[in-house]
Amino acid sequence: MTLLTIAAARVRLHELSLESARDLNADSGSGGFAWLDGDAPDGTRTGSGTTVKAHAAGTYREGWGTYVIVRAEDGRAVGGIGFHSAPDEEGRVEIGYDVTEGARGRGYATEAVTAIAAWALSQPGVTAVTANTDLDNALSQRVLERAGFVHISTTTDLCAYELSGI
């Protein structure tokens, strides 16, 4: 399996191997990355667990797993981003992301979301990239809006966003 790297101006998104995903899914594993704050954020660990489960279930498709967000300037890992699963039958795919506390407010999440959404929408059959945020997570909502996503609905606890292909 060839692991994908998606490059943006200041960050590189490195697709996790199964071994790295397993290591990150463990409470103290680094996945082989040097983390800015010394440890991976919880959401990245959860996402790597989703990748491990997809491999075990035989549903994993290359490119549609978890990526580590790495700063180009120094190679430090600042967060994770990835897909909840491969695209569905309608061509829709959902993303999730988080960054370490020390990397927040610097535009890394917006850059990573923009890059992974552009990659996804360039894949055959993909029609839309979606994301959900907690209702009270205004920072994450701004990340999605800056990346071109449109708010499409709100429930009692979630805001749903979508970026459609051209």
List PLM regions with ranges.
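GNAT-family acyltransferases
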Residues: M1-E94, V99-G102, A115-W119, Q123, ...
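Conserved active-site tyrosine of GNAT-family acetyltransferases
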Residues: L144
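Short acidic/polar active-site loop segments enriched in Thr and Asp
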Residues: T127
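Glycine-rich acyl-CoA binding loop
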Residues: G105-T110
